[in-house]
Amino acid sequence: MNRIPRRLRQLSLIALASLALSACKGADSDLSKESVVRTPEHQSELDKYIEEQFSRPYNIEVLYRYREYEIGRGWVTSPARAENSLQFVNVLRYLFLEPYVETTSKAFVRQFSPQALILTGYSGYNPPPSNTYTLASTINGIKIVFMDINHLDFPTLKALYAEREALQGKTDATSVARYNELDAQIKKTNQSYITTLRTSYLRTIYHESAHTFHQRVEPTTDFDKITSLDYKGGTWTTWWTRNGKRSIQYGFISNYASQEPHEDFAELFAHYIILTPEEWAAKMQEADVIPSGASSSGKVLIERKLAIIKEYMTRQWGLDMDLLRSNVQKRYPEFARQDFTIIH
C-alpha cells in the first residue's frame, strides 16, 4: 500500500482549508442585508428602533429573525417579516406598554414585563396526531413566542378620521350622509382590528404579565379555594366539551382558566383588562347560571375571584386594575387612526 508523505498530506489539508474558506466567502457574498444570520454590528433601522424604544427603556428583547434554538422543533413555522414585526412592536407599545406606564411607571413595567418576545411568520403547525396550529406559546412568563406575525396588518385609517372630523357639525344632507358612512366604516374596521388583536396577542401579553405578579408574591389561598373542586388539570382542553358543560357557569372565564389556580388568576386578569364593560357584562350574563348540584352561579364565583385579584394588586403592587383597564380601552376607538408601519 502506497503511503502519502506527511509533508504532502499537510499541504493537501491546507489547500482544502483554503478552498473551504473560498467557498464560504462566495456564499457570504450571496447573502442580502435581510438575511436571517447577521452580525450584531450590522443593525438595521428596525434593530436600532427596537433597542432604543423597547429593550433599553423596558428591558424587553424582541427577536424577529428566525432562530430555531429559541423556538424549538416542535412546530413547523417560518420567519417573521420585518414590516409586520414593526407593526407588532408599535401595537405592543400602544396597547400594553404606554397604558401600563400611564397607570404606574416605566420602572414598574421593566419589573413586570416578559423579558423576551420571539416573533415567527406563520402559525406554528403541530404535526400529527395533533394537526393543530399554535398562535402563541410561553416559557415561565419570561419568554413569549408570538406566531402568525406575517398576518398581523393594520393599515391606518388616519385619512378617513381626518375627513370625518372635517365634516363634523355640518348639517347639509350630503355632508351628514358622508359623515355617517365614514363613521360606520371606521368603527367597523377598528372593531375588526381590536378583535383580531384580542383573540390571541393582547390577551397573551396581559396574561403573561399577570403571572409575573404571583410568581413573586402569592395572593391569598382564598382564591384557590373558590373553585378548587372544579380545576381540571391537563384535561381542561377536552373535559368541558366531552361532558356537555360550560366552564363559565362553574366560575371560569375561559376553559384554559380551569387548568389550575395560577392560570385562572392570569386568565381572569387578562380578560378583565381587555374586555369592554359591555363585553364583560355579556360574559357575566352567560355565567349567571347555577349548574345542577352547585350552590353558586359562575357569575358569583368569578366576581369573588376578581375581587381578590383587585385587592391583591392594589395592596401588594399598588396597581389599580380599573385604571389600567380604562387606560387600555380609551385607546380602542383611536386604534385605526394610528400608523403602526412607521419608525417613530
Regions found by a protein language model. Name each.
Residues 29, 86-170, 175:
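Auxiliary, metal-adjacent structural segments of Zn-dependent hydrolase domains
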Residues 74-82, 151-155, 188-196, 200, ...:
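Second-shell loop/turn segments in exported
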